Amino acid sequence: LQTSEIEVFQLLGLDGSTSLIALDIDAARRKLVQLPWVEDVDIRKVYPKTVEVRLKERQAFGIWQHGTELSLIEKSGSVIAPLRDNKFAALPLFVGRDAETGAAGFVAQLADWPEIRNRVRAYVRIAGRRWDLHLDNGIVVKLPEENLPQALQLLARLDLEEKVLSRDVAAVDLRLTDRTTIQLTEGAAERRQTAVDARTKALKKAEKNT
């Protein structure tokens, strides 16, 4: 449980000498459901001197980054509480405006591509319309606003056949249906340009010798 016994005791004013007769069960329930993690509560008096409290807590689905703030969210997108420690570090990270409301639905769409989903370190919402995937090796996959299954299928095929997600790639742009753009990392781009220049120089030299 994320809600501590101390929080419950303090909120209900229980100090070991509180009279059960004086305890208002309905008022106690209303107070407890105001705690950030509490979804529902069952509370009853067990005479002569016991109060039984059963809490149903909200379930954290992910971490939502909005600006500089980090919050824990439910599947519905509702904010539970600010992120305070590392115990939830394994939860998926969603970034940007409206990312929290579309998080669960979007992740569900990736269920058929676990080899991609398992490599995602952050789901970034762009302009409230589409998503970028930030992978564990720094590659950014820019997904389209529509036709998401087709884009993911293409990405999976490119990785299977060309190992595109294991190369010196900075970004894979799948936003357009008629073309895929692959942006190399700065180092890879420089090496490629050096190779092109060398080949061009060699061709010119060969032409002079003929």
UniProtKB/Swiss-Prot annotation:
Q: Which residues cross the membrane?
A: 8-25
- Name the GO terms of the biological process aspect: cell septum assembly
Q: Name one GO cellular component term.
A: plasma membrane
Q: Which InterPro entries match?
A: Cell_div_FtsQ/DivIB_C (IPR005548), FtsQ (IPR026579), FtsQ_C_sf (IPR045335), POTRA (IPR034746), POTRA_FtsQ_type (IPR013685)
Report the PROSITE patterns cross-referenced here.
POTRA
Q: Does the keyword ATP-binding apply?
A: no
Pfam families given in the database record: FtsQ_DivIB_C (PF03799), POTRA_1 (PF08478)
Where in or outside the cell?
Cell inner membrane
Main location, first listed in the record: membrane
- Domain POTRA, first and last residues per copy: 1-58
Task: Provide the membrane topology annotation.
Answer: Single-pass type II membrane protein
Q: Which UniProt keywords apply?
A: Cell cycle, Cell division, Cell inner membrane, Cell membrane, Membrane, Transmembrane, Transmembrane helix
Q: What does this protein do?
A: Essential cell division protein.
Recorded family membership: Belongs to the FtsQ/DivIB family. FtsQ subfamily.
UniProt-recorded name of the protein: Cell division protein FtsQ
Q: Which organism is it from?
A: Rhizobium radiobacter (Agrobacterium tumefaciens)
Q: Which gene encodes it?
A: ftsQ
